[in-house]
Amino acid sequence: RMLLKSVALLSVLAVLCHSASVSVKVLPFVDSSLPVKFREVIAEAAPRVPPNLASYAFAVDLSVPVSLSQLQCLKQAGYSAVFVRAYNPAGQGSFDTNSCNTIQNAYNAGLGTEIYMTPQPASSKQGYQQLDEIYQGLTARGITIRSVWIQVTSPTNWPSNANNNVNFINSIVSRARQYGMTVGIYTSYYDWNQITNGWSSIGNDVLLWYWNVLGGGVNGETPASFADFRAFGCWTTPSVKQFAQVEQVCQFTVNRDVYAAGTMLKAADAVEEDGKIYAGGFIQGSQ
């Protein structure tokens, strides 16, 4: 009996050791604020940017630190701008300090830079206070903010009271105007209607960055154009479209975007004569 027990024990240990040696495919970190449920996707290599595309220019948006060499690679791959997250919604929400270096690296790589915030509507801090944190954090690093994009996606992350949500968003928009910033909203037809009940009086000066994807990765892409846009809220024309999510470009995970090629300032405009770096204000909106 003892011999049989020993053999059985050795067999179990052998199975456990074999199981431990099998490699497990670990999903990469992807921003939990992605507006779709299929964010746990292993990032695939993104298709190349089409050369000599007259109508649209390409950008990426990201929420993780990116090095100068990676952004130089991005520039060489045909991208013109990056959207950098400047506010992290975790907990009560806080300024994303990683954005400072990424913005500086993007300038040095010759890319235009836009900033977006993923606000925390459940925070004890008002919306305008969250924008204040971005303003103070970036200006302390010598970065001048010309515009900000507010992420309004993932209805489950927002309170169910649309009026309260409208007031929260409006407090950010109003504060941004006080700072002299251009304001944009990152959302979709569905998200906007669910979160704000289709709020249409946000202001005609507010730009739109909409997303439309079928899933994460290359197979989930939609056309890199505005052809699928339908009017909602106060918007009849978009400025930016996110057409792909969770793809690899230059060894880091991004979402991919397009904007009208004639609506962007030159990257050389990223620095004032006093040496301060500009963040935002590159994408001017469709005329």
PLM regions: where:
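Secretory pathway export signals and precursors
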Residues: 13-15, 69, 230, 246
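Functionally critical loop-and-helix segments that line ligand-binding/catalytic clefts
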Residues: 23-62, 199-287
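Catalytic domains of cell-wall/extracellular-matrix polysaccharide-remodeling enzymes
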Residues: 146-228
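Cleavable N-terminal signal peptides of Sec/SRP-targeted secreted and luminal proteins
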Residues: 3-20
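Short acidic, gly/pro-rich beta-turn/loop elements at beta-sheet edges
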Residues: 70, 125, 195, 220, ...
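Flexible, glycine-rich phosphate/dinucleotide-binding loops
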Residues: 91, 122, 192, 217, ...
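Substrate-binding cleft of extracellular glycoside hydrolase catalytic domains
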Residues: 41-182
